[in-house]
Curated annotation (Swiss-Prot):
Top-level taxon in the UniProt lineage: Eukaryota
Swiss-Prot/TrEMBL keywords: Membrane, Mitochondrion, Mitochondrion inner membrane, Transmembrane, Transmembrane helix
UniProt source species: Saccharomyces cerevisiae (strain ATCC 204508 / S288c) (Baker's yeast)
Transmembrane region(s): 72-92, 342-362
Gene name, Swiss-Prot/TrEMBL: SHY1
Protein name: Cytochrome oxidase assembly protein SHY1
Topology within the bilayer: Multi-pass membrane protein
GO terms of molecular function: unfolded protein binding
Stretches assigned to the Mitochondrial intermembrane side: 93-341
């Protein structure tokens, strides 16, 4: 066989061997798997010998994505110091106004009581607030109303409101007589009737004028229309249910005894004594019972009427005696207006100062950029290498 024939025969067998058969496909798969198994242990280098250079900064994409959110945050940070500074300035004006108002009310408390004008209307309450006035007339004890419960010295009780008929105008007004314990709410359970349930027709009562306030939206309203109990002093509702003028009068704190004086005795006393006062105070000797209507003379052992008692001193009770007897404890002549505007002023100005500092820090950080550029990174690396290498 010639050389040419041998080559052609080898080529033909090579072509025939390349034709895929069932056994050939299995062998090729096995060879490929074994070859991959051979190359798995080879570790290639991870060093990028030719790094990709670009002029694009990593900050570009992040700035585009977060530009809208940053604008909102910066807008709020700019607005916060301005708004808080304005509110602080507004509290300065409020502080001046409240200080003048409290000073004016304290000045009114120093004035002597005067008779309430006949033409007094609810619109005048603001100008007459904390002014002492004298009301002459009689109480309607069968129309008493209560606000509470309220605690006093750890004891449960209520504020007592009683309608009052004026002698000069016949007008029906509402007087807050004071605090009374829960056990003495019923009139039959009270003692010292000349103080707890005065029945005089021409009684004089010293009160403070207070402007009526409406019930707040978050305060409880009275659910039972037939009840005489309110949770809060809703003067308009109380006046409407009792037919009174919507004006709030608060009886003053008074622990002194005010015995009933007959009309002829009052006229005789006015002739013999040139000094006149709002109440006629009488002295009782130590043997005199407080609740009784008569006293016993130590010399004659005979009972004496109120008109025969000495009048040079005054009996004065304490609060505990009034609580046990069921006598309402009036309001002390003090100002209850709160003045917290100085605290609000410091709070708003402090918030303005702190928010300004945060804004300056945020602007400085935004100016430097959130991500380090390639040039800055290269400079930092060279600086580090010179220092430690």
């Amino acid at each position: 066989m010639s050389l040419l024939g041998a080559r052609s025969t080898y080529r033909w067998f090579s072509i025939a061997a390349s034709i895929p058969t069932k056994n050939a496909i299995g062998k090729s798969t096995y060879l490929l798997a074994s070859r991959n198994q051979q190359y798995r242990g080879i570790i290639t280098s991870t060093v990028d010998w030719k790094p990709i250079k670009t002029g694009k900064s990593p900050n570009d994409d992040s700035r585009r994505e977060r530009s809208f959110g940053k604008k909102i945050v910066l807008g709020l940070m700019f607005a916060m110091p301005i708004i808080s500074f304005y509110l602080g300035t507004w509290q300065v004006r409020r502080l001046k106004w409240k200080t003048k108002l409290i000073a004016a009310c304290e000045t009114k408390l120093t004035y002597e009581p005067i008779p309430l004008p006949k033409s007094f209307t609810p619109d005048m309450c603001e100008d007459w607030e904390y002014r002492k006035v004298i009301l002459t007339g009689h109480f309607l004890h069968n129309e008493e109303m209560f606000v509470g419960p309220r605690k006093k010295n750890g004891e449960k009780g209520y504020f007592l409101f009683t309608p009052f008929i004026r002698d000069d105008t016949g007008e029906k007004v509402l007087i807050e007589r004071g605090w009374i314990s829960e056990e003495k709410v019923a009139p039959d359970s009270r003692n010292l009737h000349h103080l707890s349930l005065p029945q005089e027709e021409h009684l004089k009562v010293v009160c403070l004028v207070r402007p009526p306030k409406k019930r707040g939206s978050l305060q409880w309203a009275k659910k039972d229309p037939n009840s005489r109990l309110w949770q809060v002093p809703d003067i308009y509702d109380m006046a409407r249910s009792s037919g009174c003028t919507p004006i709030q009068f608060q009886a003053l704190y008074d622990m002194k005894d005010h015995p009933i004086i007959e009309e002829h005795t009052r006229n005789e006393a006015s002739q013999n004594n040139s000094t006149s006062s709002l109440w006629k105070f009488w002295k009782r000797e130590p043997t005199t019972a407080v609740n009784g209507t008569q006293a016993v003379d130590n010399n004659t052992s005979k009972p004496r009427s109120r008109q025969e008692m000495p009048t040079d001193q005054t009996i004065e009770f304490d609060e505990r005696q009034f609580i046990k007897a069921g006598v309402p404890i009036g309001r002390k002549p003090t100002i209850d207006l709160k003045n917290n505007h100085l605290q609000y002023l410091v709070t708003w100005y402090g918030l303005s100062f702190l928010s300004t500092i945060f804004l300056i820090v945020a602007l400085r950080k935004a100016k430097r950029g959130g991500v380090v550029s390639q040039d800055q990174l290269m400079k930092e690396k060279l600086k580090h290498s010179r220092k430690y290498m």
